[in-house]
Amino acid sequence: KQHIVDGDVFQVVISQRLDIDSPADPFDVYRVLRTLNPSPYMYFMALTDAQGRDFNVIGSSPETRIKVDNGHAMTFPIAGSRPRGATPEEDEKFAKELLADPKECSEQIMLVDLSRNDLSKVCVPQSVEVVQLMDIKRFSHIMHICSTVTGKVDPSLTAFDVFKSAFPAGTLSGAPKPRAVEIIDELEPADRGIYGGTVGYFDFSGNMDMAIAIRTAFLRDHEASVQAGAGIVLDSVPATEWQETRNKAEASVE
């Protein structure tokens, strides 16, 4: 928080990694994750690193980093969270608390502005707009505040240009992004690896769909690593932010 007091950043997203033994078959882990935490983006990847070691990336991401469809760019910043309630009444209570939390709402507005700035670099002037602001999006274990920002891509640019303008995600780094990334490098004890990256595709029609690699497990040699973070702002309460990282990691750890 001292970096925020000093004026270096408005927000920085600090994460922690959980390493656990995982003797199960990786594809069985994926099948269980699909049941426990169905999300807009589900993926199972069997890969080999530069040293010839096999590993798997398994995820159920709720968040789009950037999408291009028929010349239109879309991004859906997510910020703020509460656990799901045990009853419909408790669930609604948590949702109302989330939308009434000044810290969570200010964080969401900041990330919406960051998304608008990202798209304004690659979209037709005055085409960028916020079409949905501060909706509650529910998942199996957690709920978030979500907004939608869109724009018409400059005809002289490609989906690769759009991706470059929007990476890394402000929701996984902070604002301003360049300084937030430097602070993350200073404070986090290990490289993030796949966490906070993207999983998705570019097609031959100029379209693109990229999920942020969150709620994602990295498996190698019967060990699984799951990483989750929380956005730190001036009035953040450390214990609350720590609990948010645990809530986010819960489905992947299970």
Task: State each model region's role.
Residues 1-254:
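Extended alpha-helical targeting/anchoring segments
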